[in-house]
Amino acid sequence: MEKPVLQTQPSMLPFFDTAHAVNLLRGIHELRAERKFFDVTLCAEGKEFHCHRTVLAAASMYFRAMFAGTLRESVMDRVVLHEVSAELLGLLVDFCYTGRVTVTHDNVDLLLKTADLFQFPSVKEACCAFLEQRLDVSNCLEIQDFAEAYACRELAASARRFVLKNIVELAKSMDFERLSWKRLLEFVSDDGLCVDKEETAYQIAVRWVKADLQHRLHYWPELLQQVRLPFVRRFYLLAHVESDPLVYLSPACLRLVSEARSFQSYEYDRHDRPGHRMRPRPSTGLAEILVVVGGCDQDCDELVTVDCYNPQTGQWRYLAEFPDHLGGGYSIAALGNDIYVTGGSDGSRLYDCVWRYNSSVNEWTEVSPMLKAREYHSSCVLKGQLYVVGSDSTERYDHTIDCWEALPPMPHPMDNCSTTACRGRLYAIGSLTGEDTMAIQCYDAESNRWSLLNSGELPPWSFAPKSVTLNGLIYFVRDDSAEVDVYNPQKNEWDKISPMTQVHVGGSVSALGGRLYVSGGYDNTFELSDVVEVYDPSSRSWSPAGRLPQPTFWHGSVSIFRQFMPLVQSTFEPIDIPEANAIHLHRHHRNQALHNHNNNVNQNHNQEVNQVH
């Protein structure tokens, strides 16, 4: 016979009334309507509001401090408030009892100020939401100032984003011309300034200065520093920027123009000396991309694919395939926004051919061959010219005349060296031929001479080392280790950074956007990898940056700028391409103005000298 199952009675029953808060608020509101249990009266502009201390203290930290502290108001039955109108105090008292308030165009400013004073954060947030919905070109600057004055961070950020997005329309208004110097500098320096091309940013800056030239001229050089002149089109830089008296009468401004010209002629190394001016605004559609060329897949089949990765979108795109058999042992380098692939072999013969990828038309063309066929060499760009370095020879390519010239070879031949340009010199890092120790040699283009550097203890030997320049430092990535060494040419010292998350045997290294990208190769488990990881010098840490389109090794990678569709289409004003005669005329006017300016300076100086005598 089965024993009966005994049912145990629960010892407790947790209960939560979801309607309790609503019912409690309703009850408090009813007590107020019935005028029961009032224990304090608030007065403003002669009008009285009968309230409950507990309700006020629960709704506002201001009133909690008033009634719970040692202030005399804590024991007073009648409290006079001088900082608020009766109408706004009534709105806040009603809010304490109902949780409701009506924000209007007429009361929003004062209501926000009052809510901020009496510490009603939710009312303040409601006012901010109302103002954010009403943002337009006519009030965005005023709302941003107002939001910052009352620590409304989200509203201030929204107003700032609105200004940056609508800067072209805003620049046509009188409010823009009255903009403070500090505020304008913030806008023009922001990456988020929404212009279709950098010329528009220049025009906006010029308009503000010329609106009050006498009082704003001294701000101009610093303001021009925030314009990304390297990305202003060449004809505009010559015919509109350099020819403007604001620019050519200022040595500081002329230096900025010279920097832009150097960048556009590929003499300026943006990786060696990065800066905000070398970074295009996203709205222009110009993006710095990572380009991966060739390599081998998992079956060791040769790839002729060319893929590009845009860090802004996190997407890969196909570019024009390499038109010929790449082979192995080739080298890749970026000269401006063009990519050069040099040499290599098919296993039986060496190549002397050189292929150039023109990013503006997405096309590969063959240029003049090297003076010597070679493989497993290294190439890099120094001062706008392409250098190819082998164990026993060096040559240089001038893209303007499509011509190669022989240079002195390294005094100490190197096997599988890696080259990079840093601080105006070319550095080759590798193992000396026949030795298993690493060495570093330096080429000075001014003296046309190589020298072997004594840089202390170098990194261990590596079969296929890779080096890249970033922020004036040379990052050295070994082929068989996750460790990364850094060489400082100024101090002639080596250091280490955090190791990579995995090894990249046969991987590739490049600099992009002020960060270091390492991709592909075989990992710690000898599996072919598609991992791309990135090193950020500011945080001194590695992080994942996506994956290659497929696992790849022995590929090349470089970074270039490539034009995509601008995010905005409107322009500040029409810009016509000047004819050649017009450019010559601009040059003549500029030279004439400089001549007149110098004459005036000399005359003033002579007058001062005569007065002294």
Swiss-Prot record:
The cellular component terms of Gene Ontology attached to this UniProt record, alphabetical and capped at eight, are: Cul3-RING ubiquitin ligase complex; cytoplasm; polar microtubule
What keywords would UniProt list here? Answer: Cell cycle, Cell division, Cytoplasm, Cytoskeleton, Kelch repeat, Mitosis, Repeat, Ubl conjugation pathway
What Gene3D superfamilies does the database record attribute to this sequence? 1.25.40.420, Kelch-type beta propeller, Potassium Channel Kv1.1, Chain A
PROSITE patterns for the chain: BTB (PS50097)
Check the record and name the CDD domains matching this protein: BACK_KLHL21 (cd18460), BTB_POZ_KLHL21 (cd18250)
Q: Which residues form the BACK domain?
A: 140-242
Q: In which pathway does it act?
A: Protein modification; protein ubiquitination
- Keyword Cell cycle annotated: yes
Superkingdom assignment:
Eukaryota
Instruction: Note the segments forming the Kelch repeats.
Output: 289-337, 338-384, 386-424, 426-472, 474-514, 515-562
Signal peptide from the UniProt entry: none
Which is an annotated GO molecular function term of this record? ubiquitin-like ligase-substrate adaptor activity
Q: Name one Pfam family in it.
A: Kelch_1
Q: Where in the cell is it found?
A: Cytoplasm, Cytoskeleton, Spindle
Q: Which GO terms describe its biological process?
A: cell division; chromosome passenger complex localization to spindle midzone; proteasome-mediated ubiquitin-dependent protein catabolic process; protein ubiquitination; regulation of cytokinesis
**Chain ranges of the BTB domain:** 38-105
Oxidoreductase among keywords: no
- Role this protein plays: Substrate-specific adapter of BCR (BTB-CUL3-RBX1) E3 ubiquitin-protein ligase complex required for efficient chromosome alignment and cytokinesis. The BCR(KLHL21) E3 ubiquitin ligase complex regulates localization of the chromosomal passenger complex (CPC) from chromosomes to the spindle midzone in anaphase and mediates the ubiquitination of AURKB.
The record's subunit annotation is: Component of the BCR(KLHL21) E3 ubiquitin ligase complex, at least composed of cul3, klhl21 and rbx1.
Q: Could you tell me what this protein is called?
A: Kelch-like protein 21
Tell me the organism: Danio rerio
